[in-house]
Amino acid sequence: MNKESLFESINKLSDYECINPYSSVVDLEYNETESYWKSGNIQELYSISRSGRGETDHQKVPFCGGIIIFQKQALEKLSGWNEEFWGWGAEDDFQSIKVRNFLNHLQVKDKCYHLWHIRGNIDRDLYFRNLHLYNHYINMQKEGLSEHIEKTKDLVGDFDKIKKMVK
């Protein structure tokens, strides 16, 4: 992403509680990533003109996926990130729902460049568990989400929170 755009986004935190400094993700290919690592020339990335995820296809980029900037008190207002999600999947989607419902937020029109890397194996059982949990939360009304946030606020920073959440 363009560093000037990132700094502009950070400077807008006085007006917004949460900012996503990009709206699409360009997934770099192996050779593009390797070339960037060798040259260190960020302009090479900026010269890539293809569309990113979410621009011309059905893929969505979660508001809270990847780079996300919060005011500290805004993150506290949301009770942080929901730690009921384990492994990979859906935690950023749920955080996005909380942001859209409870915070003054901004999504900047810019591209983010995702370096190519080997993808790890996803634990499908945990992934489907996360989807089940996510479906539970997306079916809540705003009042139910608010109650959930209030209920979990005292668990932020508590190392024994998982034990308390399953009781």
Segment roles from a protein language model:
Residues 2-83:
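Conserved catalytic core of nucleotide-sugar-dependent glycosyltransferases
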